[in-house]
């Protein structure tokens, strides 16, 4: 899930400070609005990358961490009946739920990098990251639920929906191209027919002119013959 930059441009001191701030657990801060905004931006970037992944690749084949098998096994052992296609926020945020989630999350401290970082989690897995469909959760909680959604086939709804839309766009674009090609061909054929027709008319006129001239010459020849006959007599 990590992304790297291909540039070696110097990083400003301000960005270094923000990066350092984001490398610390969320509980290290109070309600600092700047830090909260930085956390929100980082969480949103993570969400965008993840949504693009499950939209472009069959989620059943995705591997989110090096320990997906362990996360999934522990998750279903501790939350066997938890519904994950549409989450109930109370199953994640209530005091009793937090008590149950805490030992599970701490088990991955040192195993999963940034295990307790704030991450955006979708409530309804068939929908995208909207304000109404998103809650904040520790990253290990995000991994546990999303790995389960991928393996159990729930996230495939997003993949199928996006692929269907792209397929429709392709069909529509193909139809437009074929229509344009047909118009061009008709225009071209019409032009050729028009040119041919014009040539035929010109040829007809030329033939008529030649015929008329031929007739006149014939009449003149007849006159000359008649004159010769009269002289001969």
UniProtKB/Swiss-Prot annotation:
The keyword Phosphoprotein applies. It comes from the Eukaryota. Residues 167-233 are annotated as: Disordered. Transmembrane segments: none annotated. Keywords: Phosphoprotein. The modification Phosphoserine is found at residues 126, 181, 197. Belongs to the PBDC1 family. This is Protein PBDC1. The gene is PBDC1.
